[in-house]
Amino acid sequence: MEVNILAFIATALFILVPTAFLLIIYVKTVSQSVE
């Protein structure tokens, strides 16, 4: 179970980090378009 939990955390970070990075770029692009 411990290994599965660590794998789940690693996978979650691997997915969330790039997603958050893309969201930040998207928000910046939209804000610039509105202006």
UniProtKB/Swiss-Prot annotation:
Pfam families associated with the record: PsbM (PF05151)
Membrane-spanning residues: 5-25
SUPFAM superfamilies: Photosystem II reaction center protein M, PsbM
InterPro entries reported in the protein's UniProt record: PSII_PsbM (IPR007826), PSII_PsbM_sf (IPR037269)
Record localization: Plastid, Chloroplast thylakoid membrane
Keywords: Chloroplast, Membrane, Photosynthesis, Photosystem II, Plastid, Reaction center, Thylakoid, Transmembrane, Transmembrane helix
One GO term describing the cellular component: chloroplast thylakoid membrane
Any one of the GO BP annotations: photosynthesis, light reaction
Topology of this chain in the membrane: Single-pass membrane protein
Subunit record text: PSII is composed of 1 copy each of membrane proteins PsbA, PsbB, PsbC, PsbD, PsbE, PsbF, PsbH, PsbI, PsbJ, PsbK, PsbL, PsbM, PsbT, PsbX, PsbY, PsbZ, Psb30/Ycf12, at least 3 peripheral proteins of the oxygen-evolving complex and a large number of cofactors. It forms dimeric complexes.
Protein role: One of the components of the core complex of photosystem II (PSII). PSII is a light-driven water:plastoquinone oxidoreductase that uses light energy to abstract electrons from H(2)O, generating O(2) and a proton gradient subsequently used for ATP formation. It consists of a core antenna complex that captures photons, and an electron transfer chain that converts photonic excitation into a charge separation. This subunit is found at the monomer-monomer interface.
Family: Belongs to the PsbM family.
UniProt-recorded name of the protein: Photosystem II reaction center protein M
Species the sequence originates in: Amborella trichopoda
